[in-house]
From Swiss-Prot:
The keyword Glycosyltransferase does not apply. This is Molybdopterin-guanine dinucleotide biosynthesis adapter protein. PANTHER family: MOLYBDOPTERIN-GUANINE DINUCLEOTIDE BIOSYNTHESIS ADAPTER PROTEIN, MOLYBDOPTERIN-GUANINE DINUCLEOTIDE BIOSYNTHESIS ADAPTER PROTEIN-RELATED. GTP-binding protein that is not required for the biosynthesis of Mo-molybdopterin guanine dinucleotide (Mo-MGD) cofactor, and not necessary for the formation of active molybdoenzymes using this form of molybdenum cofactor. May act as an adapter protein to achieve the efficient biosynthesis and utilization of MGD. Displays a weak intrinsic GTPase activity.
Length: 178
């Protein structure tokens, strides 16, 4: 139990960006990440995909190593590196978050994983045909493009600085509560 407490105290904070498909999660992140970086917050992202994904290309050396049976392949050059891992079963969000380098990351934004028990900002747009999803105990704020009466912070989905302010304040509170 002590290890768990120590780990929890040293964990990089995770903040989910959730909502239905088409709610603008990726678009919001594309605009939000540079805004947070300008505030000297080092951001990393975990994105969940429901589709089978292939990072490398068929026939390339890294693909051939994977096809030969390697459980992990690191592809590296002078600018970046990526590790590709074959997983026989789904991995947890906690496991994925532990893969980040703490010296490069202050905050992990998580796109998807909406059922995970992590703090999150829920996105919804007025033009969506689906109603506002359930606001569970982990939803810190709701970002919309329409007025809404809720018992959480309401953010304007089109005002990136406002959302960044909210995240920056939450992040300071997270570090202060540790």
């Amino acid at each position: 139990m002590i290890f768990k407490v120590i780990f929890m105290n040293n964990q990089i904070p995770l903040l989910g960006i959730t909502g239905y498909s088409g709610s603008g999660k990726t678009t919001l992140l594309e605009k939000l990440i540079p805004e947070l970086i300008a505030r000297h917050i080092r951001v990393s992202v975990i994105k969940h995909s429901h589709h089978n994904m292939q990072v490398d290309k068929e026939g390339k050396d890294s693909w051939r190593m994977k096809e030969a049976g390697s459980s992990q392949v690191i592809l590296a050059n002078d600018e970046r590196w990526a590790i590709m891992t074959e997983t026989p079963k789904p991995v947890s969000l906690d496991y994925l978050a532990q893969q980040f380098d703490r010296t490069l990351t202050d905050l992990v934004l998580v796109e998807g994983f909406k059922q995970e028990p992590i703090p999150k900002i829920l996105l919804h747009r007025q033009e969506m045909t689906k109603p506002l999803p359930e606001i569970d105990e982990y939803v810190l704020a709701v970002a919309t493009n329409y007025p809404l009466e809720i018992d959480r912070t309401l953010l304007d989905i089109n005002r990136i600085p406002q959302i960044a302010d909210f995240i920056e304040n939450w992040l300071h509170h997270f570090h202060g509560a540790r």
